């Protein structure tokens, strides 16, 4: 089988707002409806889309963008178990706050090597600490190892690992802020993420 499709989107292309994940998940959903009787769950579609992104398009990415698009809405996703991420849908409880995307005209299409460096450098830190990924490293062990790490990896790699640990804590706080409709706490967390 096959299909012919025409698509139209308001998602900005190449601006860092998951446009490729949107397209990949769209194709996965079309195939799901046409050939799978709509039996595939969101995470399975996200994994297929992630495969297309990383293998076919050669973009070194994680599963976040595809999962968020496939799930829709606001979700708390824990990727500790990458085979079956833990997903919790969260109601957006802010009547006075909207999420707005602004097209700044930026383009990250030629930044693949820079994105690849993020993962590569964090994995370098993890390997030195005895694991393949930072999610397996305890935060305490990481911070205690900074003097030794600084002799083996770049300062940027250490800062990226610090961001990893801090960002994971921030995500938990963001989810709590959304559940409690605390706009102040939520924006503090978002700003902290951007500053990091």
Q: Which residues are covered by each model-predicted region?
A:
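Gly/Ser-rich oxyanion-binding loop with an adjacent helix/lid
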Residues: 1-92
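C-terminal nucleotide
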Residues: 76-196
